[in-house]
Amino acid sequence: MQNELPGFIFELKYRMPDGTGIYVKPQKKGFCDASGRRRKLYVELEKNGKTQQLYSIPDEYLPDRIISYCSGANSSMEDILIRSPRASLASDLYDLSLAMDVENGEGPVSGKEEHPGESSVARGEAAEEILSFYERLDVNPRVLFLDAVTSKFILPALFAVMPFDMQDDHISEKALRYATLRKKLLKRLNIRLIPAAFSLRIDDTRLEEAADRPQMSILRRLLSQDVKGKALSNCVIHRTSTDRLEEDGSLAGETAAVFLFESWEAEGEKVFYHPMLQRYFDGSPFALISTLLTAWREGVIREIHFSYRNGDERGLYEMEDLSDGELMWLARIGLILMAQNHCGENTLFLYDEPDVHFNDDWSRDFVRFVYAMCSMDGTSGNEFLVATHSDLILTDAMRSQIHLFENPTGSRTEVKELEISTFAAGRDSISKQVFKASSIGGFASDTIKELMAETDPEQLAQAISKIGPGYQRFRLQEQLYALLEKNDRIKG
């Protein structure tokens, strides 16, 4: 999306819903186009029987947004999606500056310049493009990376900002539909969650020193209670000092901001949201998430809390009262619900092991809820890439949707065709034929092997009484019958 290369040889092929085929690979090293501009990518577009050669992928053939959600603690997606693009663009800009210095006689000529043959005009155009990409990373990031830690920022956005324009002619209908889907999301967990408020603890010094990114400007304006010339309603701001000391010995300042949810009647149903945040973020919950994530990663937000009531019960609950599985369910499926057409017509979701922390009952409903939450109007251009080891999730996937990645030697990953269709297949068959795994644990398997060698019918019968139903119990019973028959023949 930034015309950057991953650092290895690759070929990328995909097809759009309208039939357009896109083929991408790296250009030859040092390649320049007719204008003298150095190019990194070779792109072919095949549409209506015609092929067009380009040097970048047009925006209309890229996702409006990429949302990456990784469950593991050892994920490198943050480096790949957030830090690496910025570092790569900075490196390109540095290389261009060296080439310009050499051209102007201000730098040494090494004979190994990165941009040989590139004209000064082309270098200037390249520099402007790099700066525009760099600015877009800050101003309107198209990639959001979330994990178990940052899941806490999803719940406030899910209830504060609804993904549509409040001036829409069909606002009541859309709000009711959205509220119904949110309720369905919660009902699956048997929770009657009614949002009360969310709050932020802000490090004033970090906020003052933070780079002047749009997200930081948004946060500063929110905390100043001056949003588009109006005071921020349903928000309590309290500034205080902490026990921490600044470098000059003064007490560090902190700001606590509490955002109170409101309910709005839509055809007799209560729809909870935050009116001012809804207007300020123009119906884009992802703009709110981006602001919160940026401030969190820069150390500006020290804490975030979310308070709710559970039905008619007295008292408030905190986000920490949810189990890991409950929070992960609301976060992973909630992201899909928020990605409605108002926020972009197509979003690419990269989900790594999305069933982590789920019990089997929730995993069984994961794919069903992906389809149910994807679009409120029945149309969606969203795509999902899901990495999983769950045989239960695979029972909801068609054979054409699955790619099996194997790394038998530990050095080269291979993509293989599935031997069976997993859709509605038995989990034992999937576990054995797809993952090459046994249907029982290793300890149980060793125990069964020992029992199959048992020659005392009484000992074997006693052991069988402790074995659960299934094929292994059947094997042991067959072995017991064989021993009893053998003993009868000996006695006879």
Mark where each language-model region is:
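A structural detector for beta-sheet-dominated domains
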Residues: 13-15, 25-27, 44-46, 147, ...
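Switch/communication elements of ASCE P-loop NTPase nucleotide-binding domains
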Residues: 1-9, 283-288, 294-445
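Long, contiguous juxta-domain segments that are non-catalytic but functionally important
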Residues: 35-49, 276-280, 288-292
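Conserved P-loop NTP-binding catalytic core
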Residues: 1-36, 48
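Extended helical coiled-coil dimerization/tether regions that scaffold
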Residues: 108-115, 121-124, 128-134, 152-154, ...
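A Trp-anchored, charged/polar loop motif used as the substrate-binding/catalytic surface
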Residues: 38-53, 326-338
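Acidic, Mg2+-coordinating catalytic modules of nucleic-acid enzymes
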Residues: 50-53, 57-67, 73-192, 196-210, ...
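Conserved beta-strand segments of the P-loop GTPase G domain that flank and frequently precede/overlap
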Residues: 69-70, 352
